[in-house]
A protein has these predicted regions:
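Substrate/cofactor-recognition hotspot
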Residues: 130, 137-141
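Mid-chain, well-packed structural core segment of small domains
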Residues: 100-125
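Alpha-helical scaffolds flanking conserved acidic
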Residues: 86-92, 121-126
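Short amphipathic alpha-helical surface patches that mediate protein-protein
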Residues: 112, 129-132, 148
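Acidic, glycine/proline-rich low-complexity segments that act as flexible tails and inter-domain linkers
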Residues: 2-88, 116, 142-158
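Short alpha-helical scaffolding segments that buttress acidic/His motifs in well-ordered protein cores
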Residues: 71-75, 92-99, 127-132
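Gly/Ser/Thr-rich beta-alpha loop segments that engage phosphate groups in nucleotides
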Residues: 51, 104, 138
């Protein structure tokens, strides 16, 4: 079923139209309207940087907005907002998991975030070496190259 067919069969004429957005957050919950979104947005910006997150939020359209909202509330608000693990540990876990998944662009983003969260270059290197054992040499080679690029971009290594 395509999106248009789904929309036509799932729309109800008796439903209220969505409230008009003030434009302050491009269709996302207004500040204070969703505490989980607010918490997630703050954590996301702290780790990934204001510029990257603002670009993602501003670029969202009707098709991508639900995913951006879910990422902000669920991944960042619920996941990163859970105090059981400190941000530094979460960053190291993400580096290992992104290595396993061979997601180089996302890895670069999280390497920069790891530095913001207090992970040292030596710890990033150790995580990549550990991941090599369980994820394999090809994944470790790609991830190490991506991590090096990210670290050079932010001046963490020469």
């Amino acid at each position: 079923m395509d999106i248009l067919s789904y929309k036509q069969t799932n729309e109800r004429s008796d439903m209220e139209p969505p409230a008009q957005d003030s434009g302050a957050r491009n269709g996302f919950p207004a500040p204070g309207e969703s505490p989980l979104f607010d918490q997630g947005l703050a954590l996301r910006k702290k780790v990934l940087g204001d510029e990257y997150v603002d670009r993602s939020i501003e670029a969202a359209d009707d098709f991508t907005r639900p995913l951006q909202k879910m990422i902000t509330e669920w991944c960042w608000g619920e996941g990163w907002g859970n105090p059981a693990l400190p941000p530094k540990t979460r960053s190291m876990l993400n580096i290992a998991m992104l290595t396993a998944l061979n997601r180089k662009e996302e890895l670069k983003l999280h390497v920069r975030g790891a530095i913001r969260n207090g992970v040292s270059v030596e710890e990033i290197q150790a995580v990549l070496l550990q991941a090599c054992i369980y994820c394999g040499v090809p994944a470790a080679l790609d991830s190490t190259k991506a991590a090096r690029e990210a670290l050079k971009d932010i001046g963490a290594i020469p």
